């Protein structure tokens, strides 16, 4: 059933492109964009193979997030195979999500109830409806303005909606320095009270400890390899000096 639904949505997108080659952009984004040729749009949609998911997958570390005016939280999750984006309500209840192919980093950006997904390596942004329909595909131009937008929006760890602030963070003490993603989503109200609505801190802490052990072990090996010949040479020279005495 899901395969038929996915095939139908892709077919609708291709049909709209063929029948309406010139249409107004459906995407409202902070990026400066250009139209992509129809063939490239169709190829991109087929390659990413985006699917709607209706049950919550396992929770992983957060690599990107955004919050819309209805306080729906889009969470991009860390994964090694297909990428996952899950949509949660403000109390942390799963609503729906998407999985898709992506060989690099990605970011999320709300456009009212639709979600924009930015594919960093491809320099492409797509608009996806809540039911998984791809509404538009645009090229993100290589510009100073877009680079600035990525740094200030997609790399930001806070979003403020009204009097409520949404924060992604780690709570692993000294091991925060090795984390490449975040383990918690916290909601802070106007009084400063915090409520954790998404938490994978325990799993992330174990990963951070293993990473720290690996980094320290590697550093020790490198230092040993570099300085061992120097120390050996110093000892040899000292022995020669003692012999001459």
Residue ranges and their predicted role:
Residues 1-7:
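Positively charged n-region of N-terminal signal peptides that target proteins for export
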Residues 7-245:
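Eukaryotic scaffold repeat domains enriched in small/polar residues
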């Amino acid at each position: 059933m899901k395969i038929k639904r996915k095939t139908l949505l892709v077919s609708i997108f291709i049909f709209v492109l063929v029948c309406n080659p010139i249409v107004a952009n459906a995407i409202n984004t902070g990026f400066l964009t250009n139209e992509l040729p129809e063939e490239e749009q169709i190829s991109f949609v087929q390659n990413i193979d985006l699917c709607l998911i209706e049950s919550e997958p396992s929770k992983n570390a957060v690599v990107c997030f955004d919050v819309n005016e209805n306080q729906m939280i889009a969470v991009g999750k860390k994964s090694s195979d297909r990428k996952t984006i899950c949509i949660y309500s403000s109390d942390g209840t799963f609503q729906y999500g998407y999985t898709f192919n992506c060989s690099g980093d990605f970011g999320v950006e709300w456009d009212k109830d639709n979600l924009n997904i930015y594919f960093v390596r491809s320099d492409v942004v797509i608009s996806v409806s809540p039911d998984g329909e791809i509404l538009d595909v645009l090229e993100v131009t290589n510009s100073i303005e877009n680079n600035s937008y990525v740094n200030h929006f997609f790399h930001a760890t806070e979003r403020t909606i009204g009097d409520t602030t949404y924060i992604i963070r780690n709570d692993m003490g000294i091991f925060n320095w090795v984390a490449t993603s975040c383990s918690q989503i916290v909601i802070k109200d106007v009084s400063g009270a915090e409520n954790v609505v998404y938490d994978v801190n325990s799993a992330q802490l174990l990963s951070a400890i293993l990473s720290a052990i690996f980094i320290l072990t590697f550093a020790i090996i490198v230092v040993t390899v570099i300085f061992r010949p120097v120390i050996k040479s110093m000892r040899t020279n000292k022995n020669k000096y003692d012999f001459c005495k």
